[in-house]
A protein has these predicted regions:
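Low-complexity, highly charged intrinsically disordered N-terminal segments
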Residues: 79-125, 135
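Long, low-complexity intrinsically disordered regions
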Residues: 746-767
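Short Cys/His-rich Zn2+-coordinating modules
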Residues: 30-41
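Short cysteine-rich clusters marking metal-coordination/redox-active sites
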Residues: 50-56
């Protein structure tokens, strides 16, 4: 980084974790809530008979420690269990017009919502309404639609299995499969791509597999911020000598070195564990090129070994017995030149072959990946090629090996498992029909992008959101905000105020709900819910804290209340299921047989793992084989534009998805600001710019992102050791540069990490 002093921009020399993490936890506690309440909450997080962290989906170990949480988990709990309240009195003091000018951090930092609220146009404020009136308004709005498919039912990955199951049941009895979901914006390429490759849209590894792997490849992921508890697992792998190979555009401290806050020796000495054996800074969007290069090396090493009289490096028996499509993949790889691979990836052939050599010489390999793989115009193809690489050497269905998509929100995978999908299969529809006695719709509905398009075009008029902040999470806020302002009705089930609540429909309603940390008392007693983590483990979660307000309702209860108000002739006994959540789980088990003995097994410490056929080398594909798949090649984004850079959006260390806990990004040296863009010093110099200059970021016309001009202005350039030709901005600020039409056509995932841009000097240069 340049020696030029820029306000709020510096360097962080410490490791991930360590005292920096503990200070951050203490700061989060002191800002949000009483220490006694906070300590009680933390001791219950991710523990048997406690509550599941409302943050990420990293699994819990079988034998938990006394404090089984991380820095960002502590922030998530502090944020939810805050002592601050957004009461009706708060809303009376602040018009929606005023609140629109607040920063997103300020909006949520006002604290927990306490009462149902409805927008009053005359005063330009949200005003308190009773639960009965709120439900009646929802029912009137839904019944007024001439077609159920004019309603959109959005789901956040924070929702429990029980809430999500009731939600999809309500929407389907109402008559639609319109289920835009937060997973559409993150790992949908996984949910679409992996079933085509191996027959299941989930990862194949368990936490125990990390104890047996011979190597880990981490691609497009930053666990230090997004899954901090994963660092403890990587630390153990590194300490036993297994190589960890990283491909990522930015250097991330959480992949470089780590001091475990649970290790007294490390905390006292400051001695960090080095994590990444080798760190390759691949160009943004260069992942397919890297994977193809690695597979070319595997083929070459296989041929060389056979020529020398060896057995080869491909797993011939596995390939012959379990797969199809290798010949076509080999032809595709042979037709791909190393010159193209090097140009697209930004890495040398020698570097790629060195990484591939580690892969070839390791018997059991795990590949972990995040949204750096999925949020591309070619995200599904990225996923296919990771599967291809693993299939070449039989690294699926083997102990210590497999594919590990690292999902974000704590139950985003579970929501999909229990029916949140716009494309229901026959098994799901038959299960609903047999258990609940109504005819569910079969026509495919809308994903997130299609939902926004339908709202924009006037084809959808009602939006109900089970959590989340859809307007801010979605690409192209200019188009998304304008679309949502056309709605007849918007209903938000939420714990805190966010910007989506301020985009006013003709009728706008906020329904406050319990958080994961809070006691849920129903007629049948205190209730627990369940969640599914990234490795298909299902376990119970029971809040332990007093609710933020006595007026709150649980998410399952709110969904059931809406259903009962809207569907006078319902076939479902909603009230019985709300009185006793065991009955919801009985319904889940009836519709989804993989939940056999659900209520019994979920009460066992640690819960249970759902059946993943690919783990047993059983492939749920049409021909019962795993598939080697090829894509469009490395030039699918169209011709390269001179002087264009490729933008990726990233999270700061002080945020989780659209929730911004604070304005710092400790591991990248940013303090008190978010208006920065990370760029390689050479890319700055080539444009006559310097570290600290104020710049404008403009899109360039492209096949993927369209020709409409888009820009963000007045950002500060931060010289950073990011891959050449790549730049990074924080999400959601960078969403303004992503066209609504810029998404992976196979999965519908917005291409938040595939945006061609140019940077130019802003008119004013004061940093």
């Amino acid at each position: 980084m340049s020696e030029k002093k820029v306000p709020g921009v510096g360097e962080y020399d410490g490791p991930a974790g360590g005292w920096g993490a503990l200070r951050a936890v203490a700061g989060a506690i002191s800002k949000q809530m009483a220490v006694v309440r906070e300590t009680s909450a933390m001791r219950r997080m991710n523990q048997p008979n406690g509550f599941d962290c409302p943050g990420c989906a990293w699994p819990d170990p079988k034998h938990t420690s006394s404090f089984e949480f991380c820095e960002n988990g502590a922030k998530a709990v502090s944020w939810e269990a805050t002592s601050k309240r957004a009461t009706p009195e708060f809303f009376a003091k602040h018009t929606v017009s005023e609140l629109w000018g607040w920063h997103d951090h300020q909006l949520e930092d006002e604290g927990r919502l306490t009462h149902p609220m409805a927008y009053d146009k005359a005063s330009d404020t949200y005003v308190e309404v009773s639960w009965e009136e709120a439900m009646q308004r929802v029912a009137v709005g839904l019944r007024a639609l001439p077609d159920p498919n004019m309603a959109e039912f959005y789901t956040s990955g924070r929702a429990s299995n029980e809430a999500a199951f009731l939600y999809q049941l309500f929407a389907r009895e109402y008559g639609t499969n319109n289920f835009p979901d937060c997973s559409n914006m993150c790992h949908e390429a996984t949910s679409v791509g992996l079933p085509q490759s191996i027959g299941v849209g989930k990862g194949t590894v368990s936490l125990e597999d990390f104890d047996h792997c011979d190597a880990i490849f981490s691609i497009g992921h930053n666990p230090g911020t997004n899954h901090p508890r994963m660092l403890g697992t990587l630390r153990e792998v590194a300490q036993r000598g297994a190589p960890i190979i990283v491909f990522n555009p930015l250097p991330e401290r959480g992949l470089e070195r780590f001091v475990s806050p649970q290790s007294p020796a490390e905390m006292l000495t400051g001695k960090a564990t080095e994590l990444a054996t080798t760190y390759y800074k691949v160009k943004v969007g260069g992942d397919v090129a890297v994977l193809k290069g690695m597979m070319k090396y595997v083929l070459a090493a296989d041929a060389a070994d056979r020529a020398a009289g060896g057995p080869g490096k491909l797993d011939d028996a596995f390939i012959a017995q379990h797969t199809v499509g290798l010949d076509a993949l080999v032809d595709d790889l042979n037709a791909t030149s190393w010159e193209t691979i090097e140009r697209k990836s930004g890495l040398s052939r020698a570097d790629i072959e060195a990484a591939a050599s580690v892969y070839v010489n390791a018997k059991r390999v795990i590949v972990c990946y995040g949204m750096g793989i999925t949020q591309h115009k070619h995200g599904t193809e990225n996923v296919h090629h990771i599967a291809n690489l693993l299939l070449m050497r039989g690294n699926i269905g083997r102990e210590g090996a497999g594919i590990c998509p690292l999902r974000g929100h704590s139950n985003v995978q579970g929501d999909r498992t229990v029916g949140i999908t716009e494309k229901p299969n026959d098994d799901l529809l038959n299960g609903i029909r047999q258990r609940f006695g109504f005819e569910p719709p079969s026509a495919h509905g809308h994903d997130a992008v299609e939902a926004v398009k339908a709202i924009r075009d006037g084809r959808s008029k009602v939006l109900i959101c089970l959590g989340g902040n859809l307007a801010v999470a979605m690409s192209d806020p200019e188009a998304t905000f304008a679309a949502m302002a056309k709605l007849d009705m918007a209903v938000h089930i939420a714990t805190k105020l966010n910007r989506s609540h301020l985009i006013l429909a003709r009728e706008s309603i906020i329904l406050p709900c319990l958080g994961r940390t809070e006691l849920d008392l129903q007629a049948g007693g205190f209730q627990s819910v369940t969640v599914e983590d990234s490795m298909s483990m299902v376990h119970a979660s029971q809040g332990r804290l007093k609710p933020a307000a006595q007026t709150l309702r649980s998410e399952p209860a709110i969904v059931a209340m809406m259903a009962m108000a809207t569907l006078p002739n319902t076939k479902v006994d909603w009230q019985a299921m709300i009185d006793d959540y065991d009955l919801i789980r009985d319904g889940i088990e009836a519709v989804f047989p993989i939940f056999k003995d659900f209520n019994k097994r979920v009460r066992e410490p640690g819960g249970f793992r759902l059946y993943i056929a690919a783990c047993e080398r059983i492939w749920a594909t049409p021909d019962k084989r795993a598939h080697f798949l090829i894509g469009k090649g490395l030039d699918e984004d169209g011709p390269e534009v001179k002087d264009a850079l490729t933008l990726t959006t990233i999270r700061s260390h002080d945020q989780y998805n659209t929730t911004i806990y604070g304005m710092d990004d400790r591991y990248r040296g940013i303090t008190g600001r978010r208006d920065v863009i990370f760029i390689h010093p050479s890319d700055l110099a080539a444009r006559g710019l310097q570290h600290g200059d104020r710049i404008d970021v403009e899109t360039v016309p492209s096949q993927a992102n369209g020709s409409d001009p888009r820009a963000v202005r007045g950002y500060t350039a931060v010289a950073y050791e990011i891959a050449r030709g790549s730049v990074a901005m924080y999400y959601p600020e960078g969403n303004s540069l992503v066209a609504l039409e810029n998404y992976d056509e196979r999965s519908g995932t917005p291409a938040y990490k595939s945006v061609p841009v140019k940077i130019v000097a802003a008119q004013q240069q004061a940093a």
